[in-house]
């Protein structure tokens, strides 16, 4: 086939009278002819690219423009060859022509992207000047400071947690101290806010004629060369003093006894308080020497008449117990007798630590008695 032959003549197909009743339009043939005109004269010669790829000194934009020009010529060549091959045997020339155009554009885009990606540098190098180095150095220093301050904050947080733990321990110790002070107040009886008319320091005393004998045990005596020197047993008036410590008590034999207390002055009686040490500080560890069943009598000076005021039971679990008198006659008394009927299990002796008597020197408000002269 001669090289100068028109491509339009080669691609002309006989008219298909079976599918359409009219011949193909000449516009399509002329359009195909125009598309084939830019083809080179000699198709077998190698293609000569308009740009040199490895020319030194060219920028990236110039290289890309050269690649695009080369790809454009390559796409035109491929499209022309494809049209010559397929359009001579294809009846749907217009459809095939559009398909070839789309395929050519797609191939062009894919090939261009591939070439662009192949010639991109594997690592982008950033040229830094003095205007960039300064802020970057400042940023690094700021990061180091932030990291350092973060460590300091964590250390401060740990120290704060330790301080909180110490404060909690101090609060616990303070609570324990408050509890100990409360216990001491309970032992000393400071929480009972009533006047004690049986207190020795204000004039109260013991009527020894109407009081049981003191219990004398061999261990409460001291001997030197088998000669008795001193009896360490406490007298009955120890129950009128506020010093309540282990051993500082009045003991009488067996589980029955009594003590008569002369009050500092005549009193309209209302309450009586008994106190004993807790078993936790007792040397024996048992409250068996504490009194149990108690009867209270009021005594007048002349004549000495006993008036029943009440009967109670002392519980050793509560070291201080205040009892409300059951019988409150409308008169005053100069003395009080405390009668012990039993203790909490010790058959040899019973201990009494402190007895307090409460009331008022004036008649109660609900009575219509005359004040004492």
From Swiss-Prot:
Testis-specific, abundantly expressed in spermatocytes and round spermatids. It comes from Mus musculus. The keyword Transmembrane applies. It is a single-pass membrane protein. Residues 121-373 are perinuclear space. GO terms for cellular component: Golgi apparatus; nuclear inner membrane; sperm head-tail coupling apparatus. The keyword Coiled coil applies. The gene is Sun5. It is found in: Nucleus inner membrane; Golgi apparatus. Disruption phenotype: Mutant males are infertile. Spermatozoa are acephalic, the sperm head to tail coupling apparatus is detached from nucleus during spermatid elongation. Plays an essential role in anchoring sperm head to the tail. Is responsible for the attachment of the coupling apparatus to the sperm nuclear envelope. Residues 136-180 form a coiled coil. InterPro entries: SUN1-5, SUN_dom. The chain crosses the membrane at residues 104-120. Pfam families: Sad1_UNC. Changing residue 273 to M: Impairs nuclear inner membrane location and decreases interaction with DNAJB13. This is SUN domain-containing protein 5. PROSITE patterns: SUN. Keywords: Coiled coil, Differentiation, Glycoprotein, Golgi apparatus, Membrane, Nucleus, Spermatogenesis, Transmembrane, Transmembrane helix. Highly glycosylated in the Golgi apparatus during spermiogenesis. Its main location: nucleus. It comes from the Eukaryota. One of its GO terms (biological process) is spermatid development. Changing residue 259 to M: Decreases protein solubility, impairs nuclear inner membrane location and decreases interaction with DNAJB13. Residues 1-103 are nuclear.
